[in-house]
Amino acid sequence: MDNSPPPPSNESPPPQPPPPQATHTGSPTDFLKGVVGKRVIVRLTSGVDYRGLLSCLDGYMNIALEQTEEHVNGVVTNRYGDAFIRGNNVLYISAAEPI
Amino acid sequence: MDLSSSGIQEPFDLIRLSLSERVFVKLRGDRELTGILHAYDGHMNLIMSDVEETILIVDTDSVPTGQGVLQVAKRKMEMLFVRGDGVILVSPPART
Amino acid sequence: MASQILPLELIDRCIGSRIWVIMKSDREFTGKLLGFDDFVNMVLEDVTEYETTPQGKKTTQLAQTLLNGNNICMLIPGSVGPDEEG
């Protein structure tokens, strides 16, 4: 549920206790836990797609991708070893392999 | 959170590791920059030097199906502040 | 007092069933709702994306997808989407 960005440092203990159930609830947080390290398709509101390995993301939906391909209208237009995508541009993150 | 292959735990780590390196920045309005990254903040405001800007001028009028390419304009700037809300993507140099 | 249902309660009751999502732009999604958060970011499964472009309509099939709540305009519970009226 909590979609706020993680605290910048780990000096203080986390304020909230862990969620009571670790089972799959289907929440956005659970989805993201399952999809980190997997191949994903990130579509921006502009319609441009980025396909790559999801390294990590934060509460703003800022995304770090590895082995990234940029697709415009189904055509590869760029490749990046790493890419930081600013979250406000993100329309969706879709799993491109089984979670 | 899990880190896959690298020492990256949050997306901003990617930017932090690119400080003093030449980066590629994709901006709204079909603009692209390459330059040395000197500083950034949580908004993705950037300070870059030795920048080359590439502006893609998409001529949609002449090609009714859209995506009519285009004309490319380039220019250079010594030092630049980039407002974070225009940033779409930042790509650091390849890590080894 | 008449019993009132909060908007997000309605969406909560949709979890597990199909939902039609209409974005602020010319873009729509249908899929099975797995969950959502306070921002109405939504996790959908077996998703169809519908785009209306100058070149015509385009659909894309997607597996499990996290849809950013920022650009959502309307939600229609239990609907199969723009193809047939549910």
Curated annotation (Swiss-Prot), chain A:
Record domain Sm: where: 27-99
Organism of this sequence: Laccaria bicolor (strain S238N-H82 / ATCC MYA-4686)
Entry similarity comment: Belongs to the snRNP Sm proteins family. SmF/LSm6 subfamily.
SMART domains the record matches: Sm
Key words of the record: Cytoplasm, mRNA processing, mRNA splicing, Nucleus, Ribonucleoprotein, RNA-binding, rRNA processing, Spliceosome, tRNA processing
GO molecular function: RNA binding
InterPro entries xrefs: Lsm6/sSmF (IPR016487), LSM_dom_sf (IPR010920), Sm (IPR047575), Sm_dom_euk/arc (IPR001163)
Gene Ontology cellular component list: nucleolus; P-body; sno(s)RNA-containing ribonucleoprotein complex; spliceosomal complex; U4/U6 x U5 tri-snRNP complex; U6 snRNP
Amino-acid biosynthesis found in the keyword field: no
Region feature (Disordered): 1-30
Stated name of the protein: U6 snRNA-associated Sm-like protein LSm6
